[in-house]
Each structure stands twice: as structure tokens, then as C-alpha cells.
């Protein structure tokens, strides 16, 4: 038995060695309670077990194991190690991101730790008592209940039907979870290829809580069911439901009732029967109730129907299968509306059929609600949704359930789902792989979920499918070089055709007097035509709020944040007016007078979504207008309400930021207006053109997704802009070739790796001295590969001043060695007395 364990703690520290007490059995990847320092108690992960005694006198012992299950398998530990190494952070920082908060309690004593320790919820499971697990006794019982207690009759019928495996369910009664309506029609595609999954009923061997109990009943159960005691009270005529249930019972009891199935149990949450009726059956000794540890989201018996593929989709699916035989990763480059999701569904079904796990990554769960709902309609209770907006208890229960799973799991999640314990992970699908939401900015590790998905799939011996209509240039070049396979789906699904894209010259409209508010006449006329035909419109302005700032027309004063070096955004929601900082959240009232010169008519400058909403409602007073941005979506319920209202055609015009570009499929939208393309193209970022193309193409793709032709109008003061013309021509490859040529010339990704170093401190002089010292230390090792120090456009946030240093490493050099040298320089910088108080952040592959 190993005597020592290297334990990873949720700290920005290396692993520490603890002693394993005699008689305690531990496994690598298991969670344990340890004391760290004089009075801190933490959850730790056993990383290595060994017999090498450390070179210090007193070694603290592991206090006790936690959770009773291994949290991390070998592949997952290797994945954590890769993340920590590549993104230059500690395993403890990976642990902080990977595990739900309730799995990382801490305290100043064991008692305080125990008070915050996660305790699984229990739930009630029902089973037939042994006396009624035969056909003869069930026939007799149904006959008695049918005469005197129709509600108990229906409850027992539901329990028996739920216990039976589907092939034995001759009555056609849905099995567990009522089949979750998983055989419902599939969205916008014809359903075929019904795939039945192996039936299985919850058994008495399911994990139970330590305090699991059986509810006792008094007396002999067989005696409690005389005709005198079975009634439910005053007699009543049988309801339609009970008559239907009687027919179901006849069919059910006409089929064989295997005793092994009747010996199973069913959780309360899967029964529609009211609790008082179940209690009556329990009290009279027909059923038994026991408390078990809740296993949320566990896959029940399901059968799912797969959408019929078009010939083009079928060819793509075949190509992907063939490429998976020789490559880990494949890029599915499909135009908007081409039906990439249908291909995902077929690959997911094939993987689940083999008993393997699937992970579908989406940029943001809330913004891809339609995709999640589609998957739930197809795969039913197999779908587990995981993201940061779930309660910590729900996230923890899901994590622990997956630790016990033997495979066949399907998780749909945002980037954090990458760290779930899917032991048989064989397929990762990254939808909208280009999306910047896959990159974590804070805290460390500052990882890109797309890149991590490729590594995870390789470590688990699986495959990754990267899907996008506008792939990132890194992914596109990897496919062009043969690192990834590439499959192109170049036509829209069904009758839908690509939208017509029109460039509208804003400067010309102003000169001709053909502009009202922030709309060219060309766009206003198109909106009027769509409204007259009963069609819907989406208007895109990638700036929330009413105006970017307010200004004094007399002296030029603008309101600025006291904590950050930015102007305050003017918001005007309903009757309230306020100035808000979008960096730190500072809010203040709009001044009545200019603080500098006392002029009273302060003027909003520029426009955001709130102003667009107000102006379009004034120009089209009969139109029903809604807004979708971070300010209007105060909760998931508000988001779903806005989206559902637009889908029902309760809204004619939807105004929004980039939130309207992600994953939506509204059949009534025939016009999309992009109100200000210039602020996308002219951003001071080497990726500006690529991102402008991606965003405008994704927004444009919302138009004309059914038989109704779509049109997109792009308002710009620079109609000759290459990227805007490339969007209008839907020419991704022209954009890619041009941008890659420029990046090759100036030595930017994907022809170089970047590491961005950000220094923060409240003393600007100390900060800039430290930034200069760090840049010089890096130049002594990396030479001209170092840029900076630089002052970012926003150089003060939350009271801290910022400075930056950028390291470029050519793609042909060893990035592993570069990180090793960089770590040496950073450690030496942090150890120095003068600059140790400077907060230094390291971002590998910054976005």
C-alpha cells in the first residue's frame, strides 16, 4: 500500500504531499479532506500515490476520503495536466474551474468544513411489495381496485407499466419517464430511423443514501385488502380516465408479467399520480416507499427518432465517418441554414448506440435554447444540460452522477462542460467553433474550449467535429494543411435559399436626404414592405444602451467612470435614465446640468439598441417591437419570453446585439438590417475583419430560412470595404485568403503563437516600472519576439491601472520550450521584492 499521496488543492499552488494513514485505501483521482497550514481544511484531489518520503520532518495525514467515488480517471488527469501546462497555470487553478463550488468546501476547522460539505438529496422510490409480484395476485388486486378505488387502480397501473421493459409493454403504455415524449415529431425535418435503446429499469441495487429507509406498514398486507377496507371514501362514477385505464389494464395483464421486472423500483418524479393516492397504496401494503440518493438526469429507457437527411447531408455524413477513420478532428464547414444539426444528431445517435459518451459544446446555453430543445425532443432523458447558470447543487449532482456512469451519456453544455467526468468520451461536437465565447478570460486557466476539445478527444481515443458557417482562420488553415479533415455543406436545407445581401451607402443617403434617424430610406422601405406582407424583421446593432456617451455641446464635457478610464454609457429604460459603466458596473444619475459649464442641454451621442428600439417604434407605430440584449434579458425566463414571443409572431421587429445571431431559426424572418457595419470592421484588432465577416454572416443567416426569400441590408459609410464586399458575396474563402496573407506578412496567428501578459496595480508609476522591467527581461531571452510594454485602450479598470507585454512565438519554434523559458522569467519577476505586489496575468492564445 502506498504511504504518501500528492494532493492537488484548489489554490494557485503546486501539489503537496500528505501521508496516507494505515488502513486507509485511496485511489488516484479521488477527493479527500486535508488540513493545509495551521487552520485551513480543504478538499483535495489525490494526484499521485507513492512511497517516496518528502524531505521534511512532519507530514500531515489525509483525514478522510470524500464522496465515495473516483472523481477523475486517468484520461481526465492527463487532460488537466495538459491544460495546466499549456495555459501556464497550476493544477489547483484547473481544479477551481473544473469542479462545482459545492465540491470544494473549505473551513478553519473540520466542523466548519463539514457544515459546508455537499450532501446528496434523497428522493422516494416506489416498488411493489413481494406479495404482489405475481400475475395472479396482480389480477386479483386490479379487480378489487377497479371496483372500489379507481384512483388507486390508475396509480397501480402506472407503476406496473413503468416497471415493465418496453418490449413487454403490450398495452403501449410509455415506460419510465413516459418516454419523455421523445417520439415527438422532429422540428423541421421528417423523422425516420427509430433507434430503440436497450431497455432497463431502475433496480433495487441503485445507489442509496446512507440513511435510506423503508416505510413500514402494520399488519398483514394481504389482510388489509378486504372489500370493506379498499374504498377511497364516498363512491363516485368511474371517470373517463379510469375507463381508459381499465382498457389499458386488460391489455397489460393479458401480456406476460416477468417477476424480475416487477421486482424493480420507480422514482417518484417519474410518476404522474398524486402523492396522497400513492400514500394510500403504501399504507395498505401494496407498494413500498424508500429513500434513495437522488440521481438527477440519469438516462431512462428512451427511443429516439432521427431526422431524414437530404442527399447533400447524407454525403457529408458519409465523408465524416470516413475521415474519422484516419483523423481525430473534422471541420464541417456548412453555410447558415444548411442543416449541420441534423448531421450532429446522426453522429450522436451512433455514438450513444455503442454505449459511449457524447459532449456537444455550444457557445452559450441561453443563446442556443432552440438547439438544446431540439436535442431534448430527439434524445429525451439522455440529454444532460450543464452550464454555469445552473444551481451549484444541480451542477454537483450532475458531476457525481456522471462519476458513477458506465457510459451512454449525452451532455450539452458551455465550455465548462469539458471538465465533466465522461469516462467513455468518444465524440465531441463543437457547434459554432469560431465563437469567442469558447475562450475564458478570467480566472485562470484562460483556456479555449475548442482547442481543449481537440486535445480531450485525442486523449480519450475519440473524435471531435468542429462545425461552423464561418470557421476561425486557425481551424480553416489546419484543415487546409490536412491536420483536420474537411467536409463542406454548401447548400441550405429544404426549400430555403441564401438571402440576397445588399450594401446601402450611408454617406450617399445623407447627401440625398434619404435618411431618417439611423436608417437609410432603402432599409425603411424594405421594413415597410415586410410588415405589409406580415413578415418579420431583425435589426442588428452591436452596441447596447441608448448612447455610448452624453456630451455637453458647449464645452465638450463627457461623463466618465470614477473607477475605469471609460465614458459612461447612457441607458434609458422606460421612464428612468442612468449612466452605467460596462466594465465595473458603476451607475449614476444623468446630471441635470453640465458639471463644467452648467449648460443644461446635455446631448446623447451615437446610438445603441435602446435608441434603435425607440426610433423604429416611432417610425412604425403599428409594429410590435422587442429588444434582445444583455439589458433586456435580466433572467433566463425573460430571454425565453422574448424569443418565444418572436417565434409565435407576437413581435414584428426584433432589435438586438450579437445575441440575435446565435442559433436562432425563425421561419417568419425575411429581412435583416445591419445598422452600422463600420464599427465592426474598424475595431483596433488584427482579428477585426475576420470577426466582422463572421458576425455579419451569422446575422445575415437568420433571414429566409424557409420558403420565404430573405434579404439583408448592410448600412455602411465604406461600401468599398473588402470585408463588407466579401460578406455581400458570401465569399468566405476570399476573406480567408486575404486575411491569412496579411497575417503571414505581419507575423500573427495562425503563423505565430501569442502570449499576452497583463500587469495590474493601483500605483501607475510602479506598474509602468514593472512593465518596462518585465519587457526587458523577456527581450534578453526572446529578442525581437517581445512587443511592449503597451498601454491598452482602457488602461484603468476597477481602480487598477493596466499595462501589457506581448510575446510572439513563430509556429515553427518549440512552443513548449518557449513556455518553459517564459515561466522562468515570470517566476523571477514575481520573486523580486520591488514588483512582487504587481498582479501579473498570463493569457496563452489571447482572443
Region locations from a protein language model:
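Accessory, non-ATPase domains that flank or precede helicase/AAA+ motor cores in DNA-metabolism machines
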Residues: 1-468, 480-496, 781, 806, ...
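Proline-centered flexible-loop/turn and helix-kink motifs
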Residues: 271-272, 621, 708, 782
Amino acid at each position: 500500500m502506498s504511504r504518501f499521496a500528492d494532493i492537488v488543492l484548489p489554490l494557485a499552488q503546486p501539489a503537496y504531499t500528505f501521508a496516507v494513514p494505515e488502513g486507509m485505501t485511496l485511489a488516484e483521482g479521488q477527493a479527500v479532506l486535508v488540513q493545509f497550514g495551521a487552520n485551513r481544511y480543504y478538499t483535495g484531489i489525490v494526484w499521485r500515490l507513492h512511497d517516496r518520503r518528502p524531505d521534511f520532518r512532519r507530514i500531515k495525514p489525509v483525514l478522510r476520503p470524500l464522496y465515495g467515488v473516483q472523481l477523475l480517471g486517468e484520461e481526465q488527469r492527463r487532460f488537466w495536466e495538459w491544460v495546466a501546462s499549456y495555459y501556464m497555470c497550476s493544477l489547483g487553478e484547473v481544479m477551481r474551474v473544473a469542479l462545482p463550488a459545492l465540491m470544494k468546501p473549505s473551513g478553519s476547522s473540520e466542523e466548519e468544513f463539514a457544515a459546508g460539505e455537499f450532501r446528496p438529496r434523497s428522493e422516494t422510490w416506489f416498488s411493489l411489495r413481494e406479495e404482489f409480484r405475481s400475475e395472479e395476485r396482480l389480477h386479483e388486486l386490479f379487480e378489487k381496485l377497479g371496483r372500489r378505488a379507481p384512483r388507486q387502480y390508475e396509480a397501480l397501473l402506472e407503476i406496473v407499466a413503468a416497471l415493465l421493459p418496453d418490449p413487454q409493454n403490450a398495452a403501449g403504455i410509455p415506460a419510465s419517464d413516459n418516454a419523455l415524449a421523445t417520439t415527438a415529431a422532429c422540428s423541421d425535418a421528417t423523422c425516420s430511423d427509430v433507434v430503440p435503446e436497450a431497455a432497463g429499469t431502475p433496480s433495487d441495487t441503485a445507489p442509496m443514501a446512507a440513511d435510506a429507509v423503508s416505510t413500514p406498514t402494520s399488519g398483514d398486507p394481504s389482510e388489509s385488502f378486504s372489500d370493506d377496507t379498499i374504498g377511497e371514501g364516498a363512491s363516485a362514477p368511474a371517470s373517463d380516465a379510469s375507463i381508459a385505464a381499465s382498457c389499458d389494464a386488460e391489455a397489460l395483464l393479458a401480456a406476460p408479467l416477468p417477476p424480475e421486472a416487477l421486482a424493480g423500483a420507480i422514482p417518484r418524479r417519474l410518476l404522474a399520480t398524486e402523492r396522497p393516492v400513492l400514500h394510500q397504496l403504501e399504507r395498505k401494503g401494496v407498494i413500498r416507499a424508500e429513500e434513495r440518493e437522488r440521481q438527477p438526469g440519469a438516462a431512462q429507457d428512451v427511443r429516439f427518432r432521427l431526422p431524414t437527411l437530404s442527399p447533400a447531408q447524407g454525403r457529408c455524413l458519409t465523408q465524416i465517418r470516413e475521415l474519422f477513420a484516419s483523423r481525430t478532428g473534422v471541420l464541417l464547414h456548412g453555410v447558415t441554414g444548411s442543416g449541420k444539426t441534423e448531421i450532429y444528431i446522426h453522429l450522436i445517435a451512433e455514438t450513444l448506440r455503442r454505449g459511449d459518451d457524447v459532449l456537444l459544446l455550444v457557445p452559450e446555453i441561453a443563446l442556443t435554447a432552440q438547439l438544446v430543445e431540439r436535442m431534448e425532443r430527439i434524445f429525451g432523458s439522455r440529454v444532460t444540460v450543464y452550464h454555469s447558470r445552473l444551481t451549484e447543487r444541480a451542477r454537483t449532482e450532475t458531476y457525481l452522477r456522471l462519476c458513477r456512469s458506465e457510459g451512454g451519456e449525452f451532455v450539452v453544455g458551455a465550455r465548462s462542460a469539458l471538465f465533466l467526468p465522461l469516462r467513455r468520451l468518444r465524440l465531441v461536437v463543437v457547434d459554432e467553433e469560431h465563437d469567442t465565447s469558447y475562450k475564458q478570460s478570467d480566472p485562470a486557466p484562460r483556456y479555449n474550449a475548442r482547442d481543449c476539445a481537440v486535445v480531450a478527444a485525442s486523449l480519450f481515443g475519440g473524435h471531435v467535429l468542429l462545425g461552423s458557417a464561418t470557421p476561425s482562420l486557425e481551424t480553416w488553415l489546419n484543415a487546409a494543411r490536412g491536420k483536420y479533415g474537411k467536409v463542406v455543406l454548401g447548400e441550405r436545407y429544404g426549400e430555403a435559399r441564401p438571402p440576397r445581401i445588399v450594401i446601402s451607402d450611408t454617406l450617399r443617403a445623407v447627401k440625398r436626404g434619404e435618411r431618417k434617424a439611423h436608417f437609410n430610406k432603402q432599409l425603411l422601405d424594405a421594413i415597410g414592405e415586410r410588415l405589409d406582407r406580415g413578415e418579420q424583421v431583425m435589426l442588428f446593432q452591436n452596441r447596447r444602451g441608448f448612447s455610448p456617451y452624453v456630451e455637453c455641446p458647449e464645452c465638450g464635457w463627457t461623463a466618465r467612470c470614477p473607477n475605469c478610464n471609460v465614458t459612461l454609457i447612457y441607458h434609458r429604460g422606460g421612464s428612468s435614465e442612468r449612466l452605467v459603466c460596462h466594465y465595473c458596473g458603476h451607475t449614476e444619475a444623468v446630471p441635470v446640468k453640465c458639471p463644467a459649464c452648467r449648460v443644461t442641454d446635455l446631448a446623447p451621442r451615437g446610438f445603441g439598441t435602446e435608441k434603435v428600439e425607440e426610433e423604429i417604434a416611432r417610425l412604425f407605430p403599428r409594429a410590435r417591437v422587442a429588444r434582445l440584449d444583455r439589458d433586456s434579458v435580466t433572467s433566463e425566463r425573460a430571454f425565453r419570453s422574448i424569443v418565444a414571443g418572436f417565434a409565435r409572431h407576437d413581435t414584428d421587429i426584433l432589435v438586438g446585439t450579437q445575441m440575435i445571431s446565435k442559433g436562432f431559426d425563425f421561419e417568419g424572418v425575411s429581412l435583416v438590417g445591419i445598422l452600422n457595419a463600420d464599427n465592426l470592421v474598424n475595431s483596433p484588432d488584427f482579428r477585426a475583419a475576420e470577426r466582422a465577416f463572421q458576425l455579419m454572416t451569422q446575422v445575415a443567416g437568420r433571414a429566409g430560412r424557409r420558403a420565404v426569400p430573405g434579404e439583408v441590408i448592410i448600412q455602411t459609410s465604406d461600401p468599398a470595404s473588402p470585408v463588407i464586399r466579401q460578406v455581400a458575396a458570401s465569399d468566405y474563402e476570399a476573406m480567408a485568403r486575404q486575411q491569412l496573407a496579411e497575417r503571414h506578412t505581419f507575423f500573427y496567428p495562425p503563423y505565430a503563437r501569442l502570449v499576452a501578459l497583463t500587469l495590474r496595480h493601483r500605483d501607475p508609476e510602479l506598474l509602468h516600472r514593472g512593465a518596462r522591467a518585465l519587457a526587458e527581461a523577456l527581450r534578453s531571452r526572446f529578442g525581437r519576439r517581445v512587443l511592449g510594454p503597451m498601454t491598452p485602450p482602457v488602461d484603468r479598470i476597477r481602480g487598477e491601472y493596466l499595462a501589457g507585454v506581448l510575446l510572439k512565438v513563430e509556429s515553427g519554434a518549440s512552443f513548449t520550450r518557449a513556455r518553459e523559458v517564459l515561466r522562468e522569467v515570470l517566476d523571477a519577476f514575481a520573486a523580486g521584492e520591488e514588483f512582487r505586489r504587481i498582479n501579473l496575468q498570463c493569457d496563452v492564445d489571447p482572443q
